[in-house]
């Protein structure tokens, strides 16, 4: 390379004046190509691996590229909703074949024919502009100077897409919003700031002599400043659970945020994966996507608008997270994805797995049996790893970060050999199914103010539940985990949910969730205490619970709608039902054996009235006290998984202050009688004795003041006080308390 040209490239690419918040030296983009995910220095090792231990992965990649060359076409390159995998397969095969000294131009020629004069790259009606940038970087050295400028100019037109600026603007979305980063197809739909696509372009075209060099520099400067100073702290606040759940997370952020951070790392040498706290989004992502897996299917739980998948977009990015963080859990998931055939359509991603990273399963790592993702307020619990028959539970309460989050604070799920406590069945979109954006698909307490007028009320009338923040873009308080501790025998969580309800009707709403973890062969229990204070005694309160199988009610049952609605009233009522192993639908293989049984003992209020409602035509009923909602809120996707066809409505006598106290027993299917439960009350606490004499738990939960109490496990003489603060030292060696 001529000296003057090398000097020019250094001048335009070296961001000498920029310093990331945690970098001691200026950040500079390397001169050579490839820069994105791969470097020239690493090509020889990659080529050697493709000829050795990675031969099977490379054979699949080359077969895809060769098929495309023979067909003379790149599949899906004009499909706006698909990833053009053949484009990347051809570009990567070119790099490896060229490195090995074999003919490789045919792969480049196919891409050049597809790109033509560059119009299809720059077409703002639809273009996978992020993936075109990766391919451009990978075949850069095979292009002549005119082609580099032509296609680089086409790519450069995207640097001001949507915002009108070649910079990160956060226009119409925060760091925690999926469209800020871009979708997994890296196309125009649902791309606002499109940070990932623009970063890939700015890194790819730098130094190519395009008309957009200044814009590329401006965008890189914006990234180098704003990501360390603003984005990383925001991700630390949010934590490892994507704010919009693994539903909208899988559509983009779980895949494309690691793309962006890894492209920056390989192009500059600055590893921003490690810039945040241990509980930040990227360091904790692999843990979250592991904890989401429900044992009886190995698939992600139906939480918020996500669920039913096994990887949620992580298959493509897990190799990048694993190598950037040396993360054994991400590597384990990448190898699982390869074994499950997740790279069949996109074999290029399998070649990014770094074999020097050790893979370890949760059991091999000795992960705890419970985990708090403090930013989102997500608590996961289980009885064992590597056991499809294990018990699994979720409890959540956290702030609203971004638009697509559903309002489900205080919601919980339980499974063992199938779903036991689920959310309202079926799926729906936020735009066409407003009922899905209300409270009655979740397991929480309603406070019915007949004069409340909620947002988004079309076919989603007053449900007595939480304020509806879905599709609001501003961060706001809804609920928070105020106490958490995990021990070998129990996991305890407590949440203040008051901010989630309209202040006109709720003075205080809290929920305490205590999972009593049994030893192998023992039954397990969950204790849930709700302390609810309304502004008026006339505001009726209900404890809502969704179950997948038709429950059997104790006491005298009054049939209101035969086969669908029945009511029983009394003190200490027991309700029971079986698990549903196929609750994830026919496409989800059931890994567990048999079924389990759940008993629910309603101890408070006393007396209580319990309505069982469900079955065909009654699955999605409105609130029982809202006259305009007395119909089945069905929709196009209500029959899809998760299957959860029944709802229990526990009604309390009218009073300003109400306690709901429930003990759930998780037992084998053959068990027909619930274990003994004895309740004693005083002004300070509810006190429980649960189980037989030989396996008796003693539990006390405070009914006023701090959300504390005590627990005594079977065989233990001394009660252990429950915490009134968050304890996460077992996770991080320090406690993670989310910033306000």
Predicted regions and their residues:
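Catalytic and substrate-binding regions of extracellular carbohydrate-active enzymes
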Residues: 341-574, 642, 654-660, 666-670, ...
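Aromatic-lined, polymer-binding surfaces characteristic
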Residues: 34-285
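Boundary at the C-terminal end of the N-terminal hydrophobic targeting segment
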Residues: 20-24
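N-terminal leader/propeptide and maturation segments of large enzyme subunits in energy/redox metabolism
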Residues: 302-364
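Polysaccharide-binding surfaces and accessory modules of carbohydrate-active proteins
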Residues: 544-617
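Non-catalytic terminal regions with compositionally biased, polar/charged low complexity
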Residues: 518-522, 646-659, 665-740
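Sec-dependent signal peptide recognition
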Residues: 2-14, 19
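Ser/Thr/Asn(+Pro)-rich, low-complexity disordered segments
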Residues: 174, 219-235, 251-264, 276, ...
């Amino acid at each position: 390379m001529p000296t003057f040209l090398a000097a020019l490239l250094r001048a335009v690419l070296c961001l000498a004046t920029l310093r990331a918040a945690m970098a001691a030296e200026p950040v500079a983009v390397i001169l050579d190509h490839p820069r994105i995910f791969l470097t020239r220095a690493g090509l020889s090792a990659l080529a050697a691996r493709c000829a050795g231990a990675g031969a099977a992965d490379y054979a699949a990649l080359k077969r895809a590229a060769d098929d495309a060359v023979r067909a003379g076409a790149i599949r899906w390159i004009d499909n706006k909703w698909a990833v053009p995998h053949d484009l990347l397969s051809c570009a990567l095969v070119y790099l490896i074949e060229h490195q090995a000294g074999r003919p490789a131009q045919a792969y480049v020629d196919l891409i050049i024919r597809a790109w033509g004069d560059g119009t299809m790259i720059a077409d703002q009606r639809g273009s996978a502009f992020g993936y075109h940038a990766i391919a451009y970087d990978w075949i850069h050295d095979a292009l002549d100077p005119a082609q580099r400028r032509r296609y680089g100019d086409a790519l450069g037109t995207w640097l001001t897409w949507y915002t009108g600026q070649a910079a990160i603007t956060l226009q119409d979305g925060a760091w925690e919003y999926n469209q800020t980063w871009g979708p997994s197809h890296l196309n125009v739909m649902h791309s606002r700031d499109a940070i990932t696509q623009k970063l890939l372009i700015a890194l790819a075209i730098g130094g190519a002599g395009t008309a957009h060099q200044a814009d590329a520099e401006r965008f890189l400067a914006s990234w180098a400043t704003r990501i360390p100073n603003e984005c990383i702290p925001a991700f630390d606040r949010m934590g490892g659970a994507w704010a919009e759940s693994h539903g909208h997370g899988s559509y983009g952020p779980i895949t494309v945020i690691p793309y962006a951070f890894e492209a920056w790392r390989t192009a500059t040498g600055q590893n921003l994966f490690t810039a945040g706290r241990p509980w930040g989004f990227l360091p904790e992502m692999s843990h979250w996507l592991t904890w989401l897996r429900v044992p009886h299917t190995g698939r992600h739980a139906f939480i918020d608008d996500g669920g039913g998948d096994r990887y949620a977009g992580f298959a493509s990015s897990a190799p990048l997270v694993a190598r950037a963080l040396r993360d054994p859990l991400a590597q384990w998931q990448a190898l699982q994805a390869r074994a499950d055939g997740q790279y069949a359509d996109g074999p290029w991603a399998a070649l990014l797995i770094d074999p020097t990273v050790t893979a370890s399963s949760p059991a091999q790592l000795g992960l705890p049996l419970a985990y708090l993702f403090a930013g989102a307020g997500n608590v996961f619990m289980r009885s064992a790893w590597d056991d499809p028959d294990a018990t699994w539970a979720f409890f959540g309460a956290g702030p609203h970060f971004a638009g697509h989050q559903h309002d489900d604070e205080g919601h919980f799920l339980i499974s063992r050999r199938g779903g036991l406590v689920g959310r309202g069945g079926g799926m729906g979109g936020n735009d066409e199914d407003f009922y899905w954006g209300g409270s009655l698909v979740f397991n929480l307490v309603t406070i019915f103010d007949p004069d409340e007028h909620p947002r988004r009320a079309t076919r989603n009338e007053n449900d007595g539940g939480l304020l509806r923040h879905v599709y609001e873009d501003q961060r706001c308080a809804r609920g928070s985990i105020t106490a958490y501790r995990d021990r070998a025998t129990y996991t305890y969580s407590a949440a203040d949910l008051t901010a989630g309800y309209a202040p006109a009707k709720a003075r205080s709403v809290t929920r305490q969730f205590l999972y009593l973890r049994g030893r192998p062969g023992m039954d397990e229990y969950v204790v849930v205490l709700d302390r609810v204070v309304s502004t008026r005694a006339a505001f009726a309160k209900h404890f809502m619970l969704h179950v997948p199988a038709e429950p059997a009610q104790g006491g005298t049952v009054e049939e209101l709608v035969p086969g669908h609605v029945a009511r029983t009233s009394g003190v200490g009522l027991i309700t029971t039902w079986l698990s549903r192993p196929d609750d994830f639908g026919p496409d989800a293989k059931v890994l567990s054996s048999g079924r389990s049984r759940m008993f629910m003992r309603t101890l408070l209020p006393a007396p209580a009235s319990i309505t069982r409602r469900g079955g065909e035509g009654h699955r999605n009923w409105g609130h029982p006290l809202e006259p305009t909602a007395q119909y089945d809120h069905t929709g196009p996707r209500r029959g899809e998984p998760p299957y959860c066809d029944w709802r229990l409505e526990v009604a309390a006598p009218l009073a300003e202050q109400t306690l709901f106290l429930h003990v759930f027993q998780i037992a084998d299917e053959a068990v027909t009688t619930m274990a003994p439960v004895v309740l004693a009350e005083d002004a300070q606490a509810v006190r429980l004795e649960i189980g037989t004499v030989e396996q008796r738990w003693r539990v006390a939960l405070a009914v006023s003041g701090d959300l504390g109490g005590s627990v005594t496990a079977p065989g233990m003489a001394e009660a252990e006080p429950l915490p009134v603060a968050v304890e996460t030292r077992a996770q991080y060696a320090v406690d993670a308390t989310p910033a306000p």
